[in-house]
Swiss-Prot record:
Keyword field: Cytoplasm, GTP-binding, Ligase, Magnesium, Metal-binding, Nucleotide-binding, Purine biosynthesis
The UniProt record lists the keyword GTP-binding: yes
Known pathway: Purine metabolism; AMP biosynthesis via de novo pathway; AMP from IMP: step 1/2
UniProt: GTP binding residues: 11-17, 39-41, 313, 339-341, 424-426
Any one of the GO BP annotations: IMP metabolic process
Protein name, UniProt field: Adenylosuccinate synthetase
Cofactors demanded by this protein: Mg(2+)
Active site: 12 (proton acceptor), 40 (proton donor)
Residues reported in the UniProt entry to bind substrate: 307-313
Assembly description: Homodimer.
Entries under InterPro entries matching the protein: Adenylosuccin_syn_GTP-bd, Adenylosuccin_syn_Lys_AS, Adenylosuccinate_synth_dom1, Adenylosuccinate_synth_dom2, Adenylosuccinate_synth_dom3, Adenylosuccinate_synthetase, P-loop_NTPase
Organism: Halobacterium salinarum (strain ATCC 700922 / JCM 11081 / NRC-1)
GO CC terms of this entry: cytoplasm
Binding site for Mg(2+): 12, 39
Length: 440
């Protein structure tokens, strides 16, 4: 069986915690897109683990697979694996041979392009980790894949063309000096580094044909959880373009990015992860955005700082047009609503129920950023709820939530016509109300 976990908003919804929550029923956790630009935090055995690439299930002894839809920075991968081993874990990680590899010049180009965009006030706010440039090389059919690392002759030929082309862009288009990048455009240095990566991948038997590997695990009766990074409104096709990531976090890509067929993924559950309010890192419209004391309160209570970048996140009220769009684009069979505890003790909790633009009421996300930027939120207000003990609520169940918090949850369920499987009532894995396990 498969369960696909998808962020319903702009990332940072708490996907890793939900993956961890159902980890006991899972045998394999698969990342099907993205790279080391999407941090996730998992708490297990009283220990906190912050990961940006390795699938979160490995901290509970599950197999973690980075699918062909991912872009992999081997340096980050091995740093995270080694750090987990130093803490007494034995992570079982597999890499799709078809996944593309982030190389040093990708990171340099990422920073150069963002700097150029800053001059025209059109920067995206990337993490600078080379994700976009690597996907560009994938789509341009010139990138290096994990399988290429294992073929020394093919690797050298590919690098000869690729590095020369990228150096020309870095210097002639962006006006930077490649010689000042500590070897990021040095073919010999990159080739040697890639061969070292290949030796470790080969020695630890990490590379697999991911689709075949996962199909065999499912045939053997194993449960597979497919984990998207970022969120629906950051999807390259369905998100707030151009303020998006360079891949597809939406559920449809779970098949493409893992090598499993769409009927295999579609027969399983698709769970949308929702933060009880909204947060965003980087640029782009945000109609329900807050500032001042309320924003600061939510930011501090929710710890709204990027796992990877440490940047303060922008925060706002829950945006229902965004969630309706996500529910349609992904086909959620269930949802999880996290961080209900963060909103406790506010006198009033608001929701962006709809938008208004040019006198028209809009209930879903506009297709263009320009139209979205012109939207004003139509707010719906809820009475706030008192603080509660997360452990008590998690133990007693849904009925122990304050009545006003229940009304808030039931409003979201009704608007999306989707049941809430999980309610996050505190920061820990155990501080959750589980109403339905998608694997059962």
């Amino acid at each position: 069986m498969t369960v696909t976990i998808v962020g319903a908003q702009l990332g940072d919804e708490g996907k890793g915690g939900v993956v961890d929550l159902f980890g006991d029923a899972t045998d394999v956790v698969v990342r099907y897109q993205g790279g080391d630009n999407a941090g996730h935090t998992v708490v297990a055995g009283g220990e906190e683990y912050k990961l940006s690439l390795v699938p979160s299930g490995v901290v509970r002894g599950k197999t973690g697979v980075l699918g062909n839809g991912c872009v992999i920075n081997p340096e980050t991968l091995f740093e995270e694996v080694d750090a987990l081993r130093e803490r007494g874990l034995d992570p079982d990680v597999r890499l799709a041979k078809r996944a593309h590899v982030i190389l040093p010049f990708h990171r340099e180009l990422d920073g150069a392009e963002e700097a150029a965009k800053a001059d025209s006030d059109s920067e995206i706010g990337t993490t600078g980790r080379g994700i976009g440039p690597t996907y560009e090389d994938k789509i341009g059919r010139r990138g290096v894949r994990v399988g290429d690392l294992l073929n020394e002759d093919a690797l050298r030929d590919r690098l000869e063309y690729l590095v020369d082309a990228k150096r020309a862009i870095y210097e002639d288009v962006y006006g930077f000096d490649a010689s000042e990048t500590d070897g990021a455009f040095d073919i010999d240095a990159i080739h040697e580094q890639c061969l070292a990566y290949a030796d470790r991948i080969r020695d630890e038997d990490l590379a697999v044909n991911a689709g075949d590997y996962l199909a065999d695990r499912i045939a053997d009766g194993d449960n597979v959880m497919l984990e998207g990074a970022q969120g629906t409104s950051l999807d390259i096709d369905h998100g707030n373009f151009p303020y998006v990531t360079s891949s597809n976090p939406t559920a449809g890509y779970a098949a493409t990015g893992s090598g499993l067929g769409p009927t295999t993924v579609g027969q399983g559950e698709i769970v949308g992860i929702i933060k009880a309010y909204l947060s965003r890192v980087g640029s782009g419209p945000m109609p329900t955005e807050l500032d001042g004391d309320q924003a600061e309160y939510i930011r501090e209570e929710g710890g709204e700082y990027g796992t990877v970048t440490g940047r303060p996140r922008r925060v706002g009220w829950l945006d229902m047009p965004m969630l309706r769009h996500a529910a349609r684009a992904n086909g959620f069979t269930g949802i999880a609503i996290n961080h209900l505890d963060v909103l406790a003790e506010l006198d009033e909790v608001n929701v962006g129920h709809a938008y208004e633009r040019d006198g028209e009421r809009i209930h879903t996300l506009p297709a263009t950023t320009e139209a979205w930027r012109d939207c004003d939120p139509v707010m719906k207000s809820f009475d706030g709820w008192s603080a509660f003990d997360p452990a008590v609520v998690a133990d007693a169940g849904y009925s122990a939530l304050p009545d006003n918090a229940q009304a808030y949850v039931e409003y979201v369920e009704a608007e999306l016509d989707t049941p809430a499987y999980v309610l996050g009532v505190g920061p820990g894995r155990e501080e959750s109300v589980i109403r339905q396990n998608p694997f059962e």
